[in-house]
């Protein structure tokens, strides 16, 4: 049996925070605002995986109203989601991700993101694709107000 899930997330930029995307710290003047570390890409992958197994979304499992998850490491959240995936008997077929950001440039960091995501999903790097695009200065990402991300995941039993 195969299952497909889709994820999407958005976070706005904020002063005084680290920018962590795909489990990788990226040098930049701002970070992303969120209850956890606001890793927009790992949140997207978690949502896609939860959707594929019919377990809701990241907000259901790690609500921003719970102080336990304040400043949480999103890698730990994704690892917890992956345990649910494994409990249901699934492994990764592949995951395809897109980061939507005007700045900073993501290309230099994509190999490290792929490696970290593969590690978290107990998979080979060949099963993980990460790409980045801009919105050609249109919308909130184009104005440099934040970053969006989307992912599609294929799980196999």
Swiss-Prot record:
Disulphides: none
Keywords: Isoprene biosynthesis, Lyase, Metal-binding
One GO term (biological process): terpenoid biosynthetic process
Domain of life of the native organism: Bacteria
Sites marked Transition state stabilizer: 35, 134
A Pfam family reported for this protein in Swiss-Prot or TrEMBL: YgbB
GO molecular function: 2-C-methyl-D-erythritol 2,4-cyclodiphosphate synthase activity; metal ion binding
UniProt cofactor note: Binds 1 divalent metal cation per subunit.
Pathway: Isoprenoid biosynthesis; isopentenyl diphosphate biosynthesis via DXP pathway; isopentenyl diphosphate from 1-deoxy-D-xylulose 5-phosphate: step 4/6
Enzymatic reactions: 4-CDP-2-C-methyl-D-erythritol 2-phosphate = 2-C-methyl-D-erythritol 2,4-cyclic diphosphate + CMP
Binding site for 4-CDP-2-C-methyl-D-erythritol 2-phosphate: 9-11, 35-36, 57-59, 62-66, 101-107, 133-136, 140, 143
E.C. numbers: 4.6.1.12
Residues the record lists as binding a divalent metal cation: 9, 11, 43
Cofactor(s) this protein requires: a divalent metal cation
Similarity annotation: Belongs to the IspF family.
NCBIfam families: ispF (TIGR00151)
HAMAP family assigned to the protein according to its UniProt record, in alphabetical order: IspF
Described function: Involved in the biosynthesis of isopentenyl diphosphate (IPP) and dimethylallyl diphosphate (DMAPP), two major building blocks of isoprenoid compounds. Catalyzes the conversion of 4-diphosphocytidyl-2-C-methyl-D-erythritol 2-phosphate (CDP-ME2P) to 2-C-methyl-D-erythritol 2,4-cyclodiphosphate (ME-CPP) with a corresponding release of cytidine 5-monophosphate (CMP).
Quaternary structure, from the entry: Homotrimer.
PANTHER family documented for this protein: 2-C-METHYL-D-ERYTHRITOL 2,4-CYCLODIPHOSPHATE SYNTHASE, CHLOROPLASTIC (PTHR43181:SF1)
Protein known as: 2-C-methyl-D-erythritol 2,4-cyclodiphosphate synthase
Organism: Halalkalibacterium halodurans (strain ATCC BAA-125 / DSM 18197 / FERM 7344 / JCM 9153 / C-125) (Bacillus halodurans)
Gene name per UniProt: ispF
